[in-house]
């Protein structure tokens, strides 16, 4: 193989390794919740790179945060496949329970903590977010769209009203964040009981929309 091609392959391999190291460092830093953790230059330093390397790999800080979100989305999709593979003849309540349990445990993961801390540092107003961080905003929008599609697919064969599925899919992430927060803070409440109650309520709501 010509030396120029060998050099090109080596350079590409080093670039990919640098990119992976920066994304891993970003998740670790963001998940820590430390003051100043939402800093691309600090993350670059922790990964042994420079701000110039961030710009080369991702363009700017917007591209960097978008890449972090995309990276965690890939791992999230792999996790969600655990419950989307529920047998097609599984009853409705079992499917709701699988979704709730998966999120309840998954929201305590390093990836989830990283995303929560990143979102907390971004503009709350969608117009500001889209103006200042257009690629990050697009990735966040993609998350929501993918989640809705996943939930619709989970109940598609049961004849459930799609609008009710949409409402339930919109509710569940926020509800699970609340329960996870209670668990992290320490609570006298029985959180297993809370999950069962939520599961029963949502399953009943969806069941009522099925053809009789």
Enumerate the predicted regions with their spans.
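Basic, helix-initiating cap at the start of DNA-binding domains
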Residues: 1-33, 37-46, 63-66
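C-terminal peripheral helix-coil segments that are non-catalytic and often amphipathic
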Residues: 1-6, 102-105, 145-160, 170, ...
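Solvent-exposed, amphipathic alpha-helical segments
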Residues: 21, 25-33, 78-86, 118-122, ...
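Short hydrophobic/aromatic patch on the recognition helix
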Residues: 47-58
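Hydrophobic alpha-helical connector segments
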Residues: 67, 81-114, 168-172, 195
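Short, basic, alpha-helical segments at the C-terminal edge of helix-turn-helix-like DNA-binding modules
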Residues: 70-76
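Amphipathic alpha-helical packing segments from all-alpha helical-bundle domains
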Residues: 77-81, 108-118, 126-157, 167-170, ...
């Amino acid at each position: 193989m010509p030396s120029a091609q060998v050099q090109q392959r080596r350079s590409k391999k080093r670039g990919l390794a640098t990119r992976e190291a920066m994304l891993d460092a970003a998740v670790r830093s963001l998940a820590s919740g430390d003051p100043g953790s939402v800093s691309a230059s600090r993350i670059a330093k922790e990964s042994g790179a420079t701000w110039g390397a961030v710009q080369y790999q991702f363009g700017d800080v917007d591209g960097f945060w978008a890449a972090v979100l995309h990276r965690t989305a890939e791992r999230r999709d792999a996790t969600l496949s655990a419950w989307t593979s529920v047998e097609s003849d599984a009853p409705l309540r079992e499917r709701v329970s699988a979704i709730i349990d998966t999120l309840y445990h998954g929201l305590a993961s390093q990836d989830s903590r990283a995303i929560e801390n990143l979102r907390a540092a971004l503009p709350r107003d969608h117009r500001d977010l889209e103006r200042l961080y257009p690629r990050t905003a697009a990735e966040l929008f993609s998350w929501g769209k993918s989640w809705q599609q996943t939930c619709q697919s989970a109940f598609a064969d049961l004849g459930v009203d799609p609008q009710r599925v949409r409402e339930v899919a919109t509710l569940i992430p926020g509800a699970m964040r609340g329960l996870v927060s209670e668990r992290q803070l320490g609570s006298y409440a029985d959180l297993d009981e809370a999950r069962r109650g939520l599961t029963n309520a949502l399953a009943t709501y969806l069941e009522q929309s099925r053809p009789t």
